[in-house]
Amino acid sequence: MRPLAIVGPTGTGKSDLALAVAGLLSAEIAVEVVNADAMQLYRGMDIGTAKLTVVERHGVPHHQLDVLDVTETATVARYQQAAAADVEAIAARGALPVIVGGSMLYVQSLLDQWSFPATDPRVRTRWERRLAEIGVAALHHELADVDAAAAASILPTDGRRIVRALEVVELTGQPFAASAPTIGAPRWGTVIVGLDWDTTVLDERLARRTDLMFERGLVDEVVGLLGVGLREGVTAARALGYAQVLADLDAGGDGSAAREPTFVGTRRYVRRQRSWFRRDHRITWLDGAAGGSAALADKVIRIWRDVS
């Protein structure tokens, strides 16, 4: 049985669509979801990641949720190994694995059997020290000097990925992209469906989504996570919403001023997601406005059946 993947930008309704698919298939086959959202890996990061609550999951098993403490570093390599094991275990018990998420590298690592270059802690530490010394913007310029393509694909604010790219270039003598997978037949023959909306409509959805996060207590969630080490987290503290709230709190605010930069940052991230996923010719795209969740789920199932 071929797995199903539902991918696309943030805020498009992928999680709800997966549940609707599970509901329509419930009389025929069990469905289990494998999360492909990097920040939903973290325990306690619920409101700012729009993570479904246990009640909202309606009894559908979800994997790769709440598997890391905020002090732990999320890595694509670790996720790839753990999520692949989940997919294969789900299929082995006769259920349908449905991979759901929009974290671009995580999705690709799972579907394209990405091989990751080795890491050297000494080299990594040296570049991390360099980052601390000169700052993320200057280090991004240094990456551009040795690997212009990598610099063009990595945000100049993403210090962790800049360090990793410089580490790979130094260790392999090759461009960072040389370690990336080429798009071929997806692993396990996975059927990939993309969900998107018109840009104007999605921007409105993102604004409502951001407002709702702050209304539901994102600031309190961040404050609570500070007590368990959020500030020490390499990846968790940089998550959209969390980073903006932290910055406002550090500036003496109460966190409420983080709403607008969170929305702007999310909208910018969505543009990157859309550009990334639209390059993948294997994805069959659906318009989120083309019917309710049941109608969209029916389309997804028909696409899956046609290929399977």
Curated annotation (Swiss-Prot):
Disulfide linkages recorded for this protein, renumbered to the chain, are none
Q: What is its EC number?
A: 2.5.1.75
Q: What class of enzyme is it?
A: transferase
Alphabetical list of Pfam families matching this protein: IPPT (PF01715)
Q: Tell me the domain of life.
A: Bacteria
GO MF, one example: ATP binding
Q: Where does ATP bind?
A: G8, P9, T10, G11, T12, G13, K14, S15
Q: Kindly state which reaction or reactions the protein catalyses.
A: adenosine(37) in tRNA + dimethylallyl diphosphate = N(6)-dimethylallyladenosine(37) in tRNA + diphosphate
Q: Which cofactor does it need?
A: Mg(2+)
Sites annotated Interaction with substrate tRNA: S103, R124
Q: Name one GO biological process term.
A: tRNA modification
Function in brief: Catalyzes the transfer of a dimethylallyl group onto the adenine at position 37 in tRNAs that read codons beginning with uridine, leading to the formation of N6-(dimethylallyl)adenosine (i(6)A).
NCBIfam families linked to this entry: miaA
- Family that this chain belongs to: Belongs to the IPP transferase family.
Q: Which protein, by its recorded name, is this? A: tRNA dimethylallyltransferase
From which source organism is this entry? Mycolicibacterium vanbaalenii (strain DSM 7251 / JCM 13017 / BCRC 16820 / KCTC 9966 / NRRL B-24157 / PYR-1)
